[in-house]
Curated annotation (Swiss-Prot):
Consists of a catalytic RNA component (M1 or rnpB) and a protein subunit. Coiled coil: none annotated. This is Ribonuclease P protein component. GO terms for molecular function: 3'-tRNA processing endoribonuclease activity; ribonuclease P activity; tRNA binding. SUPFAM superfamilies: Ribosomal protein S5 domain 2-like. Keywords: Endonuclease, Hydrolase, Nuclease, RNA-binding, tRNA processing. Residues 1-10 have a biased composition (Basic residues). One of its GO terms (biological process) is tRNA 5'-leader removal. Belongs to the RnpA family. GO terms for cellular component: ribonuclease P complex.
Length: 113
């Protein structure tokens, strides 16, 4: 579970991260990363209706939240992250989703630096 201080809540934060951050995309997810100094890392999720019904979207969000908690533990400060789930994420097995997520984050962070 992500602590409140690590959750992205306002649309302004989402917009800033997506527009000015670096992007890394894979089959199941697209990740936008913006590096910032001194602030706690924050994570936000975008799971549209194209992914599936409400039950499916919530399942995808729970899975992505668990992966993001791992990222925040590794880097508790200095990174804003927006994770956008693509429709194939609804049926992706856990290991494939985890591999795509980690790879997309690594690509986006590398492009930021």
């Amino acid at each position: 579970m992500l602590p409140t201080r690590h959750r992205m809540r306002t649309s302004a934060h989402f917009s800033t991260t997506v527009r000015s951050g670096a992007r890394g995309g894979r089959r199941n997810v697209v990740v936008s990363v913006r590096l910032s100094t001194g602030a706690p890392s924050r994570v936000g999720f975008v799971v549209s209706k194209a992914v599936g019904n409400a039950v499916t979207r919530n399942k995808v969000k729970r899975r992505l939240r668990e992966l993001s908690a791992e990222t925040v533990r590794e880097r508790p400060e200095g990174m804003d992250l927006v994770v956008r789930a693509l429709p194939p994420a609804a049926t992706a097995p856990w290991d494939e989703l985890a591999r795509d997520y980690r790879s997309a984050v690594a690509t986006a962070v590398r492009r930021c630096a």
